[in-house]
A protein has these predicted regions:
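Small cysteine-rich, disulfide-bonded extracellular modules of the LU/uPAR three-finger superfamily
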Residues: 1-73, 80-115
């Protein structure tokens, strides 16, 4: 999770931040994520997210259908104002033109943090 993501989560917990998770993005760069990330390194596409939650788990899902072939290496979750709250690196995932790609990101919230 990014620093901005942790700040957003703290603000949501106190009711001071009303922004919502809105989009999932995918990209082609495999550079390790950092807390200071503000964007995907090499964004391919971004689409609307579906968010569901139960007690301590938040599931974020999105579906992509790309017009050309890409190797997907990174995934990011964005708020409705475009703020990146988390970025993750994947094993190389080759997606052919017209092939669907479904992405799910799961946040687990516990006393020890967000995972």
């Amino acid at each position: 999770m990014t620093s901005a993501g942790r700040a957003w989560l703290a603000g949501r917990a106190t009711g001071e931040d009303t922004r919502s998770i809105a989009q999932v993005g995918i990209g082609s760069d495999g550079t390790e994520p950092t807390e200071s990330d503000t964007a995907l390194v090499s964004e391919i596409a971004r689409t609307a997210a579906t968010v569901s939650s139960s007690s301590d788990v938040v599931d974020i899902t999105a579906s992509f259908n790309l017009a050309q072939e890409y190797t997907v290496r990174e995934v990011g979750v964005f708020l409705d104002d475009g703020t990146l709250i988390g970025r993750w690196v994947l094993a190389d995932t080759l997606i052919g033109a017209g092939e669907p790609l479904d992405v799910t990101v799961e946040f687990r919230v516990s006393d020890g943090g967000v995972y």
